[in-house]
Amino acid sequence: MDTDVVVESGHYGRLVVARLKPNEDLIESLENKCLEHGIGRAIIRGVVGSLIDASLERGYGNTTCEQPISGPGVEILSVFGEIDLRDRGSPNTVLSGVVADTKGQMFAGRFRRGANLSFITIEASLQEWISD
């Protein structure tokens, strides 16, 4: 696997605690919260809530596959990743996590943009990353 590694120094900035309302997409909504607060890059500190259905991506490169998880009421167990909006025309947001379906079966992968709508609400905390 050929992977680029970037090491940078920086510090944490503002903390945003956000509530996503029903039928809002996880990735798009968190990106919008960053834009509302003038944040170009943020890390995910924590997320709780549920999704109507979930859609995760697994694998790497040409060997990726979609993992649909049927709801309603798919529980979010963990979310981690980074929101990068420095290139406004092409956001680079990668959020990964673990969810559980209505039977308690767990699934892990990268959340797919536009395919993970909040069920009731989702609460998330985002922390700004400022490069030195």
What are these regions (language model features)?
Residues 1-46, 52-132:
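N-terminal intrinsically disordered, cationic/polar leader segments
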